[in-house]
Amino acid sequence: MLPSISLLLAAALGTSAHYTFPKVWANSGTTADWQYVRRADNWQNNGFVDNVNSQQIRCFQSTHSPAQSTLSVAAGTTITYGAAPSVYHPGPMQFYLARVPDGQDINSWTGEGAVWFKIYHEQPTFGSQLTWSSNGKSSFPVKIPSCIKSGSYLLRAEHIGLHVAQSSGAAQFYISCAQLSITGGGSTEPGANYKVSFPGAYKASDPGILININYPVPTSYKNPGPSVFTC
């Protein structure tokens, strides 16, 4: 039996409503998909992670695979992470960094352990509904802290779709990790209170993950994960 037109349309809309984070660039230049970003498992289907205890919650990779290249950026500068086609769902954009230990190769390092510190999270605008500035956008500037040590880092981009998050396990995580070489840094190492592991940073019951954003409309929002590290 041939599938109905309505089923085909639903499938097409479902795919188009999802997205990836395949590129990162500095200055005004653009880069190829997955050039500096580790190719995520959703590179073909634009899917999402819904299990916060899965290994995919780290960089959306079931099997480790490095990026083609590592992007060199100066500490204190702003770079841009790109979505494809664009963020479609309401929810926060968040960014984490993890420094590759001295003596290890960024291409083989997986980012395991309590090494991730948050450098940005998005708060909504409150009113008759929650409004997220990331919704509908395809590029996201993120500033590299000026005080952190120079070295090799993974930059983890994460958008959490909260449109159906009133049920446990229904929040949608869109994730990828870029490879950076940060130069001209300072001497600061974020403290243990800022660092988390993936998996381990989130619980499915966290108030910023298990939440009904539609009714009653929340008057506050607590981002999942640690506090944002600042210099």
Curated annotation (Swiss-Prot):
O2 binds at residues 50, 163, 172. It is an enzyme of class 1 (oxidoreductase). Disulfide bonds join 59-177, 147-231. Its main location: secreted. Cu(2+) binds at residues 18, 50, 89, 174. Residues 1-17 form the signal peptide. One of its GO terms (cellular component) is extracellular region. Lignocellulose is the most abundant polymeric composite on Earth and is a recalcitrant but promising renewable substrate for industrial biotechnology applications. Together with cellobiose dehydrogenases (CDHs) an enzymatic system capable of oxidative cellulose cleavage is formed, which increases the efficiency of cellulases and put LPMOs at focus of biofuel research. Binds 1 copper ion per subunit. It comes from the Eukaryota. Gene3D superfamilies: 2.70.50.70. GO terms for molecular function: metal ion binding; monooxygenase activity. Keywords: Carbohydrate metabolism, Cellulose degradation, Copper, Disulfide bond, Metal-binding, Monooxygenase, Oxidoreductase, Polysaccharide degradation, Secreted, Signal. One of its GO terms (biological process) is cellulose catabolic process. Its EC number is 1.14.99.56. CDD domains: LPMO_AA9 (cd21175). It catalyses: [(1->4)-beta-D-glucosyl]n+m + reduced acceptor + O2 = 4-dehydro-beta-D-glucosyl-[(1->4)-beta-D-glucosyl]n-1 + [(1->4)-beta-D-glucosyl]m + acceptor + H2O. Belongs to the polysaccharide monooxygenase AA9 family. Lytic polysaccharide monooxygenase (LPMO) that depolymerizes crystalline and amorphous polysaccharides via the oxidation of scissile alpha- or beta-(1-4)-glycosidic bonds, yielding C1 oxidation products. Catalysis by LPMOs requires the reduction of the active-site copper from Cu(II) to Cu(I) by a reducing agent and H(2)O(2) or O(2) as a cosubstrate. This is AA9 family lytic polysaccharide monooxygenase F. It comes from Neurospora crassa (strain ATCC 24698 / 74-OR23-1A / CBS 708.71 / DSM 1257 / FGSC 987).
